[in-house]
Amino acid sequence: MSSVLRNQDNPPTISEVSSTTKENTDNSNSKQEEKEKEKEISSTIENPTFVDDEEDNNPFSHHGEGLTSFMTANSFNEGPNTKSDKRTTKENNNSSSNNNRGDNNDDDDDDSLLLYNTSNNNKSNNVSRVNPMLKSTGEVFKTVNMNFESRVTKLLKPNTKIRIQITEAGNSNEGMSNSSKKYTVYTIKLINLEDPNNDILTRRRYSDFESLRDVLTKIFPLIVIPPIPPKNYFDFSMLNGLVGSNHENSSLSVAGSNGNSGGSGGGGASGGAGSGSGNGSIITSPKTYSYINSTHLTKGKLIEHRKRLLTNFLNNCLEIKQIRSLEFFAKFLDPNANWGDEIALIQSQLPKSIYLSNPENGLKTDPIYSNLPNPSNKNTISFFKDNKKKLTKKTNKLLSNGSENHDIGVGGGGGSIGNGGNGVNGNGTNSQSQYIANTSMLDDINKRIMENYIGLSNDYSKLGSTFNSFSLILAETTTTTTTGVSSATKKSNDNELNLIFDKIGQVFDRSYITINSLIGELETKFSEPLGEIVQYTSIIHYVAKYQSKKIKQKSMLDNEIKDKRKTLEDLLKIERESNRIENAINSQVKPKNGKYNLEQQQSSTVSPAPPPGPPPSSSSSSSSSSKFKFPSFKKITQYVSEIIDQNPEVTRKQKITNLQEKIQILEKCQNIMLADLSFITDEVNKNIQSFQKRQLKMIYKILLLYNKQLIGWAKKNIDIWEEVRDEIAKM
């Protein structure tokens, strides 16, 4: 009986089960119940993996033991008793070991599908019985390494030969609240030259290109970032009569109007650019070149023009290794990336001003750069301070000599104002800028030549139609006159003249076709590259302007350190004086001072008491307070106490410590500025030298193309006229 009770509390072993079956042979009911229990236990042992997996997959196992964990714990503890009545002890041991191996294999297979290992499942179950909160400590999590590399990043590796092409430009209303409004989307094709089938297509708007270039100029202010075509195509020539001069030459000269005003305007523009230092006008804003301001171009031609220049922009960015290795540049070419989110993230990481960032890479800016002074905030004030004497002299000369206004404006005054307004160092930047060709003058000349070609093509079309109408009129007159007059010679002469007019009309028609083809070739092969050179020139001047601003920032930092040190010396001097006075007061010995204080206190205590009646002043004050209402005295004292320093010694010491810390930070900034300026000088000189070589090569190349196109056009015209001459001679 005791063995039966023990079996109810703890799981029985194989020997105990055999002994109990021998002792209780007469009790058949208890034997049948035990057999049913053993069958249930054997069924749970044969398929324990489902329950075990359910327990292992429970992510909240530390919250307590559930029914499944209780069943699995009992099943594993009662597992060896499954077949005790049918087999011997040795067979049961072998079968139990085999079953356990099978179960372990199932558990291993199931654990491979999980994010954490459950190999110590029995130990964790035993620990969970004591303290359920400790069960989660047995879980060993697997680390999932996502070594994912997109196709774009693979193609952008330095050793890969790739090329970018904008294949098409279509309209889209994706993301627009109003479906009727559409915008132009450009399809970018990233082509692997080694494997042409491995290409990637991406769709981007013009604003995406604009934001990309804007961020690149903020990250790399010293690198010449390739230009992009302007977005809006407007011709402001209608405003020239109202404004009086072009916005880029207005600060230098009144006589330098734009190129549309004939010969005098061209002379003024060239004079303004040649005399003095006309580089300041180029630094202010990038010039829109003549191709954009051509009014005869249609929207389709302008979109094709933009496709070509955006393709050049991306291919030129690929040639710059700093840009090619950027992660967000790969995101721009990745069709799966959301460019709006990427650009917002990058802009949040950049400083507000490029002068407060690392000139080598803005994304690697140290927080100490935020303590630098910003030279762009004090541009106008410093301009008037630095050029005060020059401005007064020039204004006096302008008022006294009205006839010499143009010479003074274009001469030395224009150069000084241009340099001072832009904060350009007269020695460094002008010596660098003299090696850069002024391509804006070439662009103005090209604009006038293209306008003349367009006018000539219109004249050719009118001449062709005129001569064709003459030939038709002459043919009608010959048919009417020959019926009345029988003159063979006159008829033949009229027919010859009719044919001559017809041939000359055909010549002008063919000349119209050839000159239009010339205009198209010059626009794509000469005006576009020339416009890029003009924009590159403004960009290189912008880089030179950045260098001059950094030099100005260095001088501002030196002045700030000088002022801080001066104020620190004054405060330290005041602190020494106060300490000396305090020490002198404390060092003096006053034996009579205590007696004097005691006598003074006694006199104050023995002072005569006031008369018992109410004082007259109280009644007067109460009456005055009843008549007039003044603000409370506590508010006034509080306001005064806020203005007046209550403890000047403590505040002075705090100022001294703050100034010392600030000076230490500024000295660190000074060391950083010295290193940055040396780096900036080297980079600017290197960029200007490389740009000078590139600029001369580009100009030489496009001039050769220009010469080739003109020679081909002239040969076609000669062939047309010689062909007509031979036909007329045969008559």
UniProtKB/Swiss-Prot annotation:
Membrane topology of the entry: Peripheral membrane protein
Compositional bias (Gly residues): 259-277
Listed GO MF terms: phosphatidylinositol-3-phosphate binding
Signal peptide: none
GO cellular component terms given for this protein: endosome membrane; phagophore assembly site; phagophore assembly site membrane
Subcellular location: Endosome membrane; Preautophagosomal structure membrane
Description of its domains: The PX domain binds phosphatidylinositol 3-phosphate which is necessary for peripheral membrane localization to the perivacuolar punctate structures.
Family, similarity comment: Belongs to the sorting nexin family.
Gene Ontology BP, a term: reticulophagy
Pfam families assigned: PX
Keywords: Autophagy, Endosome, Lipid-binding, Membrane, Protein transport, Transport
Chain intervals with Polar residues compositional bias: 1-22, 69-82
Function recorded in the entry: Required for cytoplasm to vacuole transport (Cvt), pexophagy and mitophagy. Also involved in endoplasmic reticulum-specific autophagic process and is essential for the survival of cells subjected to severe ER stress. Functions in protein retrieval from the endocytic pathway.
Listed Basic and acidic residues bias regions: 31-41
Binding site for a 1,2-diacyl-sn-glycero-3-phospho-(1D-myo-inositol-3-phosphate): R205, S207, K231, R306
Coiled-coil regions listed in the entry: none
Name by which UniProt lists this protein: Autophagy-related protein 20
Compositional bias ranges of the Pro residues kind: 608-617
Annotated PX domain residues: 164-340
